[in-house]
From Swiss-Prot:
It is found in: Mitochondrion membrane. Component of the ATP synthase complex composed at least of ATP5F1A/subunit alpha, ATP5F1B/subunit beta, ATP5MC1/subunit c (homooctomer), MT-ATP6/subunit a, MT-ATP8/subunit 8, ATP5ME/subunit e, ATP5MF/subunit f, ATP5MG/subunit g, ATP5MK/subunit k, ATP5MJ/subunit j, ATP5F1C/subunit gamma, ATP5F1D/subunit delta, ATP5F1E/subunit epsilon, ATP5PF/subunit F6, ATP5PB/subunit b, ATP5PD/subunit d, ATP5PO/subunit OSCP. It comes from Cyprinus carpio. Keywords: ATP synthesis, CF(0), Hydrogen ion transport, Ion transport, Membrane, Mitochondrion, Transmembrane, Transmembrane helix, Transport. GO terms for molecular function: proton transmembrane transporter activity. Residues 35-54 are annotated as: Disordered. The chain crosses the membrane at residues 4-24. Coiled coil: none annotated. It is a single-pass membrane protein. This is ATP synthase F(0) complex subunit 8. Residues 42-54 have a biased composition (Basic and acidic residues). It comes from the Eukaryota.
Amino acid sequence: MPQLNPGPWFAILVFSWLIFLTIIPTKILSHISPNEPTPVSAEKHKTESWDWPW
């Protein structure tokens, strides 16, 4: 019975967890924060308030 041989199944299990723990978290984190944080010294855009003409 080849199902009782743990060799190939253990390798598949280890390889699949290796993929889950290395590749997938990086993809999830890239979707959670897609933009790099701006440094503190970056200039802020000066926006002026605009009123409706009525």
